[in-house]
Design a protein with these regions (language model features):
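Extracytoplasmic ligand-binding site segments that recognize negatively charged/polar headgroups
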Residues: 42-56, 67-83, 90-233
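Immediate post-signal peptide segment of exported/extracytoplasmic ligand-binding proteins
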Residues: 23-40, 59-61, 164-166, 366
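Conserved C-terminal helix/tail region of periplasmic/extracytoplasmic solute-binding proteins
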Residues: 227, 332-366
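Short, surface-exposed connector motifs at secondary-structure boundaries
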Residues: 35-39, 61-65, 88-90, 283-284
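Periplasmic-binding protein-like
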Residues: 140-143, 207-212, 252-279
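Mature extracytoplasmic/periplasmic domains
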Residues: 267, 271, 276-337
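A ligand-binding cleft/hinge motif common to bilobed small-molecule-binding domains
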Residues: 104-106, 230, 235-255
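Gram-negative bacterial Sec-dependent N-terminal signal peptides
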Residues: 1-23
Length: 366
């Protein structure tokens, strides 16, 4: 037998061994997770990013119970839940978190999360993950206006429109900008538009924008939700496009809803997954991560209008059904999307969370 043939056989044998090893590892993880009996999640509303279907899919596949904590929590609340339950292995201690990108590095630095690399690790873009596996991007979207067109006859097309008198008592955020990543990003996006795209000035400009909107009486200081949109309490909600589109589908035309990607200040936001350093069910947490980053989990997010972090990999392998692609908004709305760097996010997060009370002075009711 030639040396070339031996090399081919050796390579094939290694591939088989690698596959068998991965299968054995997977079986061992499943068994360990089932022995723990459950997974505790936090801040996962079922209408956010298709999480209802994601959770149902995980339960059906592995038969694990999921203890769902505080679906309406913001990223800051998730971090506080880990801190508050460091010495608690009970039902209030989250195993996993899904937070805004800027919360990943800070959580790692604070020793609140632990490293784990999923099987599909290599297909996650390097720019969207911690090199050591402490956190990695899960999905992204762009900031949008969700508008109840039964009540708002002239739909706003850009941020500056929201300051017009015709939108009095109409505009809300989908979270509290002192703790919610979604709301922090909304304030920054408004500032990015007001500052002509200057990232260094956008945080302060965003606060001024909302201060002006609040003084004009256009800002409604409650967390906007699908129900408040339909009732007319918050006929315009600034939120991620995937939440707005899911809300539109939920309402089924009653009332009619239009989702607008603004002409300027088009902000893209990445969220990240991580496992708590104090997870009561660490193996269930790892199995959850494996599920989320599998083709099945990634497509479940896409079905909920979120662009999964492995989107390009799935598209290259023709894994995305055409019907799913057809449900997404037109690509041109995303052409001007800006992905802020981690340093930029850390800077404007600090400005917005610390200065909201003094500059805007609006206390957000839940």
């Amino acid at each position: 037998m030639s040396r070339h043939s031996l090399k081919v056989l050796a390579a094939a044998a290694l591939a088989v061994c690698g596959t068998q090893s991965a299968m054995a590892q997977s079986a061992a993880l499943i068994a360990a997770a089932k022995a723990e009996g459950q997974l505790t999640t936090i801040a996962l509303p079922h209408d956010w990013c298709g999480y209802g279907a994601v959770i149902a899919g995980f339960k059906a596949k592995y038969g694990l119970k999921i203890n769902e904590l505080n679906p309406d929590a913001g990223s800051g609340d998730e971090i506080e839940a880990i801190k508050a339950n460091k010495d608690n292995k009970g039902p209030q201690a989250p195993d996993v978190i899904d937070v805004g990108l800027s919360f990943g590095p800070s959580s790692k630095a604070a020793g609140l999360i632990q490293p784990y690399k999923v099987a599909t690790w290599d297909s996650i873009p390097a720019s969207a993950k911690d090199a050591d596996g402490y956190w990695y991007g899960d999905y992204y979207g762009v900031m949008s206006f969700q508008v109840n067109t039964d009540l708002i006859s002239k739909v706003p097309t850009d941020w500056a429109d929201l300051l017009k008198p015709e939108y009095k008592n109409s505009v809300s955020l989908a979270g509290d900008p002192r703790v919610s990543s979604q709301a922090i990003q909304a304030v920054y996006a408004a500032g990015l538009s007001a500052a002509g795209g200057d990232a260094s000035k956008a945080g302060a400009a965003g606060l001024k924008f909302f201060a002006d909107m609040n003084k004009a009486g256009n800002f409604v200081p409650v967390i906007g939700k699908t129900a408040s949109l339909a009732q007319g309490t918050t006929p315009i909600i600034i939120s991620w496009d995937y939440n707005a589109l899911a809300g539109r589908d939920t309402l089924k035309g009653n009332p009619k809803v239009q989702v607008v990607v603004p002409k300027s200040g088009v902000l893209a936001g990445v969220y990240v997954q991580a496992i708590s350093a104090y997870a009561p069910h660490p193996n269930a947490a790892k199995l959850w991560m494996e599920y989320l980053y599998s083709d099945e989990g990634q497509l479940a997010w896409l079905n909920g209008y979120c662009h999964p972090i492995r989107f390009n990999d799935l598209a290259a392998k023709n894994k995305i059904p055409k019907a799913m692609m057809d449900k997404l908004p037109p690509a041109e709305g995303y052409a001007k999307a800006v992905f802020p760097t981690l340093d930029q996010q850390s800077a404007y997060k600090e400005v917005i969370t610390k200065q909201w009370d003094t500059v805007v002075g609006a206390n957000i009711a839940k």
